[in-house]
């Protein structure tokens, strides 16, 4: 096995024995084989698109299949085998359609012709030969590095496209790029500059995917408004829902109405409390726990069932394996998988389990500082900057993880001067989300913009402020201090680079899949840099 797509990869180089995420070598091989099969499907789809025969079922399958290969999504070998077989069936169907439409009948490249083994062990063996270090990708290490950057970015795009599609938002251009990008992995004529261009194109398309998801979320549930969310618990039966998918949450709220069950969010579902069409449910109570990497202890202590809607799932303890449920692309062997948004089993389990036997007091936090909320007070923000009440904005955002070095982000926020504002989004916020940082002229100094996909909202805020001050985004009193963990973060980083945003500080470590030569290109063109210490970075930024 060889996998280095996440920040916590072993020794900062790559997982070769077992995944730090809990992924077994057999699962890694099947994920590699699934990507390989999707490359083959994409090669046919690129050609078939010219004849107008790529139906929606191919688009939908491709994004869902790619989503299953993200870190901490699908650990179920049988499920991955089903995806592989389905990819090949669809590929052959598409060849037939292409031929019937007058297109070419034969494809000779290996991914477009491969046949899955008849059994799981055979597939695993096939997967071991088509991984990230195989000749599926370029021999040149720098081109291969850019191929992998693009591949991981495409996985992030696919995740956002899947979320958006569930809410009825899609754009053919997103699907077309996914096919083009995957098929390009087999184009030996592409050089270093071509791959830099493709990586940045991935960033451009990811902006569109996030825009679609934003339209789906706000169009369905309203724009987020400032909302207080309790971190304590209310006496009564309880269900915990984690992940990102707001529609899954909505369906759970509808099906639990009047049943005496309180619904709690976990992880990246926290911002859901700010959406008007969700917070109208009286039994949508509060937030439980912190970021994904703490779930093993937090889930074990939760007195009700847990629903995982999207990444990030870790190996469940035996103590709660019988009360954790997966949905959509998420799967774990032994955990019940919910289909068609039917929560009957979850509700039954919640009524059987004890729930909270007494009220548990806790702090309250504020959420709901999406672009509409922040831009509604833009005049006050602009005045505060002009009057030198507000010196600087920091976007401290991104993924959380288990590495000790991530304490940097807590310390950074704690050391930010009193005349500065911190915007945050994604699960990295759980390092400091419950801190009372006060306000500047009525504007809270800590603003939760939302989920990781709400990077779109943060970009819109930055662009609006740049317009108001009549400067470029890079000339704003704004610094980006980002943490990354998985492939959605890779896609967001590519989006920021596509927009020309410079001086990004990235941590806690740089991606293992970026070679020194590729890093040099990023430094020269975008001045991207690793984090150092909070004190040094603040001094460098503020002087």
From Swiss-Prot:
Binds 1 [4Fe-4S] cluster. Binds 1 hybrid [4Fe-2O-2S] cluster. GO terms for biological process: response to hydrogen peroxide. Pfam families: Prismane. It is an enzyme of class 1 (oxidoreductase). Its EC number is 1.7.99.1. It comes from Methanocella arvoryzae (strain DSM 22066 / NBRC 105507 / MRE50). Its cofactor is [4Fe-4S] cluster; hybrid [4Fe-2O-2S] cluster. GO terms for cellular component: cytoplasm. It catalyses: A + NH4(+) + H2O = hydroxylamine + AH2 + H(+). Belongs to the HCP family. It is found in: Cytoplasm. GO terms for molecular function: 4 iron, 4 sulfur cluster binding; hydroxylamine reductase activity; metal ion binding; peroxidase activity. [4Fe-4S] cluster binds at residues 3, 6, 15, 21. PANTHER family: HYDROXYLAMINE REDUCTASE (PTHR30109:SF0). This is Hydroxylamine reductase. Catalyzes the reduction of hydroxylamine to form NH(3) and H(2)O. The keyword Cell division does not apply. Hybrid [4Fe-2O-2S] cluster binds at residues 244, 268, 312, 399, 427, 452, 486, 488. Its main location: cytoplasm. Keywords: 4Fe-4S, Cytoplasm, Iron, Iron-sulfur, Metal-binding, Oxidoreductase. SUPFAM superfamilies: Prismane protein-like (SSF56821). The modification Cysteine persulfide is found at residue 399.
